[in-house]
Amino acid sequence: MIRLSQWIKACSLDQVKEGQLFGFHSDDKKILLANQKGKIFATDLICTHADADLSTGFLSDEGVRCPLHLSVFNLQDGKPQNLPAEIPLKTYNVKIEQDEIYVEV
Ligand code: FES
């Protein structure tokens, strides 16, 4: 089955202020939004190492740090910067239209 990507509306821009994380669910997808220095990134919400919700983690210049075992994931390519996580997070395209954030899933 071919699954075409589609843009889904995530939330309004003012729900993800600079330095903040925001998690949401859409059908079977669990997505994390992060506002790093005014730019919005979208990745999977659940850590690739175990079942940790990254929206309860910590955002820094390096990326998002998992709250459970503290791996940091780069927001552009999803790659873990330190163990124990070894598998990259999936990343998603983001667009902003009329102060609403959309993610391509
Ligand atoms: S659950 Fe995220 S690093 Fe272990």
State where each predicted segment sits.
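N-terminal pre-ligand scaffold of iron-sulfur
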Residues: M1-D61, N74-L75, P88-V105
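Short cysteine clusters
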Residues: C47, C66-H69
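Short cysteine/histidine-rich metal-coordination sites, predominantly Zn2+-binding motifs
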Residues: D61-P67, Q81-L89
